[in-house]
């Protein structure tokens, strides 16, 4: 729901705004950083996370950790998609386009709310993934007790609903007034905070005191529970995870005396160890790229100053962290690389077999046309032969009857002399 209101005016539509007034960038530095670097990282991050999903959602790899990592990939994809309109606003092609200015002007704060929601979801998912790995490594027996309730579905649902509630204030935090200038060729939007003392046309603020207080308090609550607390917890648990990995590395030295169940147990522990290494790499990258943005967001809620350039740099770091997940999977997991190569080869083989089958089916259809014509000709010749043969049979039956009658008479006439001959020449 957009909070846009139209300011009626009689003469303002004839006034044309300058390029600076029509610019959607706060500064030229922000335009260069957000408009140039972000699109490349967004495209790379979306394609990389899609490849991550193809491997993590394979039927034989749907473990608890992989399901949580797949949910993290989905949250990162959503974040990258909703960040893209902010980057497009810094291009002159979209900045001067009437349709884009209307869309971006009406739904800018809804896009910001979606961005904050998806980033908050990804932040808490990283915390849950790190905590889950730490519990599996340090307390493997307690996982079965907690597996019934703390399933990936329940955990992700709780995170998504909670972060939506904490970031939903962005949908109602501002009210915007839209107007067409320069005889309807320029679209401009001006926005004010709900808690602003000055309103449009210097009128009194029509919003209630409850809404004003909610909009004032909500950013601070969001900064604490969505930004500061999860990032600090991720840093603490990531350090604990790294220390635990260093302690357990000595346990996986090659041994020749391992047999039976102990060998299977060590093999399973090695697998968990490799998964933990991948998770540690992802969480460490998240900590490095997300922490500056978290602290800048937290400080901007209390210290009012110009954070434009620093916020743009932090945004690039956040997008870079989401784009590097695919690289981290490939570098830290040999099984991920093997699965990805195998699925790529299978996809290429499927496409090649489909094209070959389509080509062969088309050639069979083309080759079958003259064969069908030949078969029809042969069938016509067979029918003609059968009709001629049937006519010959009808005429032949009559001739056979007359021939049999004549032959029977001739045989009777011939037998009589034979009998007489036999009687006359008998030796009795």
UniProtKB/Swiss-Prot annotation:
Q: Does the keyword Ribonucleoprotein apply?
A: no
Named from the GO MF annotations, one term is: G protein-coupled peptide receptor activity
Q: Does the keyword Glycoprotein apply?
A: yes
| Bilayer topology term | Multi-pass membrane protein
Please give the superkingdom of this protein's source.
Eukaryota
Extracellular topological segments: 1-30, 89-110, 176-222, 300-309
Identify one Gene Ontology CC term for this UniProt entry.
plasma membrane
Q: Which residues lie on this side of the membrane: Cytoplasmic?
A: 52-67, 132-154, 244-278, 331-428
Predominant localisation class: membrane
Output the PANTHER family linked to this UniProt entry. Answer: G-PROTEIN COUPLED RECEPTOR F59B2.13-RELATED, PROTEIN CBG20548-RELATED
Stated name of the protein: Putative G-protein coupled receptor F59B2.13
Name the lineage.
Eukaryota, Metazoa, Ecdysozoa, Nematoda, Chromadorea
């Amino acid at each position: 729901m957009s909070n846009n209101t139209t300011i009626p005016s009689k003469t303002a539509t004839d006034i044309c705004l300058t390029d600076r007034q029509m610019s959607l960038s706060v500064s030229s530095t922000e335009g260069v950083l957000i408009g140039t670097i972000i699109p490349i990282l967004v495209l790379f991050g979306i394609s990389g996370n899609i490849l991550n999903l193809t491997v993590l959602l394979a039927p034989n790899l749907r473990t608890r950790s992989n399901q949580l990592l797949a949910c993290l990939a989905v949250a990162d994809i959503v974040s990258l998609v909703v960040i893209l309109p902010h980057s497009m606003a810094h291009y002159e092609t979209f900045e001067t386009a009437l349709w884009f200015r209307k869309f971006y002007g009406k739904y800018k704060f809804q896009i910001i709310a979606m961005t904050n929601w998806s980033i908050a979801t990804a932040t808490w998912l990283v915390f849950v993934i790190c905590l889950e790995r730490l519990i599996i490594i340090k307390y493997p027996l307690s996982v079965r007790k907690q597996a019934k309730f703390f399933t990936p579905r329940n955990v992700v649902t709780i995170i998504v609903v909670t972060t939506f509630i904490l970031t939903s204030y962005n949908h109602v935090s501002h009210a915007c007034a839209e107007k067409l200038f320069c005889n309807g060729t320029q679209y401009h939007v001006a926005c004010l905070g709900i808690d602003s003392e000055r309103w449009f046309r210097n009128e009194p603020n029509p919003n209630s005191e409850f809404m004003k207080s909610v909009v004032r308090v909500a950013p601070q609550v969001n900064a604490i529970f969505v930004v500061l607390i999860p990032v600090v917890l991720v840093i603490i648990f990531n350090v604990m995870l790294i220390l635990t990995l260093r302690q357990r590395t000595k346990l996986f030295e090659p041994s020749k005396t391992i047999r039976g169940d102990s060998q299977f147990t060590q093999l399973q522990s090695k697998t968990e160890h490799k998964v933990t290494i991948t998770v540690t790499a992802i969480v460490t990258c998240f900590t490095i790229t997300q922490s500056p943005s978290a602290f800048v967001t937290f400080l901007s809620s209390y210290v009012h100053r110009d954070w434009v350039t620093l916020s743009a740099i932090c945004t690039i770091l956040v997008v870079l962290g989401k784009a590097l997940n695919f690289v981290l999977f490939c570098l830290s997991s040999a099984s991920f690389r093997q699965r990805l190569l195998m699925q790529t080869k299978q996809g290429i083989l499927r496409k090649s077999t489909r094209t070959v089958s389509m080509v062969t089916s088309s050639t069979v259809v083309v080759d079958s046309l003259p064969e069908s014509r030949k078969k029809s000709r042969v069938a016509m010749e067979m029918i003609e032969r059968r009709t001629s043969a049937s006519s010959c049979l009808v005429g032949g039956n009559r001739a056979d009857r007359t021939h049999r009658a004549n032959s029977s008479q001739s045989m009777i006439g011939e037998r009589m002399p034979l009998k007489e001959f036999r009687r006359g020449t008998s030796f009795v």
